[in-house]
Amino acid sequence: MERILDWNKYLDTAAKMVSEGIVMLKNENNALPLDADKEVAVFGRIQFHYYKSGTGSGGMVNVTKVVNILDGLIDNGIKVNEKLLDTYRKWDKENPFDLGEGWGGEPWSQKEMPLDEGLVKETAKSCETAIVIIGRTAGEEQDNRLEAGSYLLSDDEIAMLTVVRENFKKVVLLLNVGNIIDMTVINRIAPDSVLYVWQGGMTGGKGTADVLTGKVSPSGKLPDTIAYKASDYPSDANFGREKNRDIYAEDIYVGYRYFETFAKEKVLYPFGFGLSYTEFEIKTEKTEITEGAVKLSVSVKNIGSYKGKEVIEVYCEAPQGRLGKAARVLCGLEKTRELVPQEEQVVEIAVDIAKLASYDDSGVTGNKSCYVLEAGEYKFYVGSDVRSAEYACSFEQGEDLVTERLTQSLAPVESFERIKPVCEGGAFSIGREAVPVSEVDESARRLEKLPKEIAYTGDKGIKLWDVKNGKNTMDEFIAQLSDYDLSCIIRGEGMGSPRVTAGTASAFGGVSENLNGFGIPAGCCSDGPSGMRLDCGTKAFSLPNGTMIASSFNKKLTSELFTFMGLEMAANKVDCLLGPGMNIHRHPLNGRNFEYFSEDPFLTGKMAAAELKGMAGAGVTGTIKHFCANNRETNRHFIDSVVSERALREIYLKGFEIAVKEGGASSVMTTYGRVNGLWTAGNFDLNTVILREEWGFKGFTMTDWWANINVRGKEPDKTDLAAMARAQNDVYMVCPDGEKNDDNTLAALENGGIERCELQRNAANICGFLLHTNALKRAEGIGNTVKVINREDEEQEDDKPVQFYKVDRDITLDLSDVETKKGTSYSFALDLSNFGIYRVIVTASSTQSELAQIPMTLFSMGTAVGTFTFNGTGGKAVSMEKETPMFSRFTTFRIYFAQNGLDLHSIRFELTDKER
């Protein structure tokens, strides 16, 4: 079967997502939309260097072209002041964009051109409107900081914005950022219009220009509360204050849940806020309360003069009861179609009453470890943001109702105090209560839940596709696997495994010859949430970031966009995209917020489910990550998130739960760090009790790349795959070779550290996932291709003379002078005297962190030999090797560098005695 991926439609859908995700906070003095007949002045070097995404694995998408905001304006017919533009171009050439030092070392912002006031005044004479663009980035292993040029504006940016404000009649400020930044100085300078244009991927400039010119009216809404100061956020007192631990004392009161309950006066822009060029009238026309749902019919009428879309948000105010609740909690959302002036649409929203229950982790209601709908009045509010939403209806719950009985899981092992509301005179103040600690014997729980062992049969000729086709059962198939096979299948191979698409993150499943012989294919994983990361240099589509997607509040459009993403994955033989990222925006300084959706778990879960449904339409899927409470990048591989069980279940796990139950998630990645003292990679309660037993998850789980694993009370160890497998975390990502590794699996089988039945369970999970992949279809010989149409040919590198080196049996090339800057390539050729299998040894060093991922891919005659992914080496030379056949006298090689930060020393070729 051949399917079609229309690249033009892909581009258009992504640009539409950008235009719907932009959040306009302010628009005075008729600053926007722009007048097509008037010239504008554009300030800020980011006009040439649009940030398409943040940094790290979530942003390393190789693209042919990024449409920046300047391009978008010009393409939309806006005349840009040429003299100012030429001045910026000249300065930008003389002051190159600073790429930084590679993985986790990119600067948050760039140096800005000092503005000559005479030039500004002269430009203002011919331009009524000035557009100022400020950019920011952050990402993996790089949190934002409360300093100038990161969360705060730099002195250069303040000076630029000030002089422009003093001289121009209208000033439009565009924030090309991954997450919210400080607005204090911006408010003081008072531009007429302020828009968060986020990071919109490769079509970001087009979607942004569509909004600026009025082609599209902005309809994005804030997925986070913007407070006056960073210190106003309830997590601030416990974010990054300790090297190895963050205590979540704010508990369930994250973001607007805190501000609307305790501190409304600290909010500059409320959650869900966003302006349009038009105005809407929102009325709750009808409500119906049944035994299981609250149904609301809401009319939305465009009463302005521009066409546009509006978002309807439903919030619930639950009774305080004995547990304590947030003043308002998002429980429903829908987005209208585009409405022309005077057009009206009735939106239907149903709220599942059971989902309004709160988790009792202390037993104060008499129902410990249960979700409880406490007695009292449940009020519902409808509107376009949390603050302005108006009362719609209510119902009275006569008595406490248990909606779900569970068991204590993931509770903290150390006591601390958390926030709890105290009501005095109709207002809430902050009280404190002790957090319940764990009473669970984790080892005993694991032994109680051991599966039944399947008797070993040896090879019976059963292939995995026989299970798919109903010829044999999964148990019959798994019975064939030896202890050695079971030890191999829990290893992911990578990065850049030759078993799968070149330059991808890992292969899993069929990572040995024996496993391949059973018809187990090698599944393929590729980073990340913003598009496919192909470290061999292959170009892919860069998507808008997670925060922008959440800001759209458009589930339908999200699914449409990710159906295209899924087709692109299928075309590249990728089975799992390592995303969506689903962690909560607990604090605005988290560097990876750009990958994630929101401070709200309901919005997070709904948007993730929409992405997964879209990819499923193309026969592929995403891997929801990082499971769970990955809310800080600094020291992320050792950080302990100390959280109450209630906050975990209601906030930090809830989005994942929605993605599993509503989005059909079938692949999950755990974190680098700990939750309540135990590394998530080996956490039985997380990976088995909650994920599988409570939520009904049927897929497979994986660790993050080179993650630590531990047993309670013991030091972490990257080789303790037995602890990982016992927890029912199925695959360790990653090992250099799936057939041989220094892990402890086989030794643990011998000494009772793990049971064979547990490894069989892991294997069944992995194979059960592979049953539904395109990888298995290919292994079975079933055609399943994707034809890409309307995609322009990728730009080819300029032809450069290639030096040839004569080789008898071995050669070492000194590459210490080769430029290794991100995106560059180096080519050379060998003149061989002897043909055969050659060992390729690459030696390099890096001063980056030990978890930095610095890939370089070697191509032989246009085909990838493999990707050599170095970690930080502390400046010491490290060698990596692969093998490749060479049976042509003249063999040309190309090295592609996908990231900064690598110091290349040499490459050596050695003829082996292996036969072809």
Regions found by a protein language model. Give the residues of each.
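Glycoside hydrolase catalytic-domain context in secreted enzymes
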Residues: M1-S388, Q408-E850, I854-R916
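Short beta-strand elements
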Residues: S388-T407
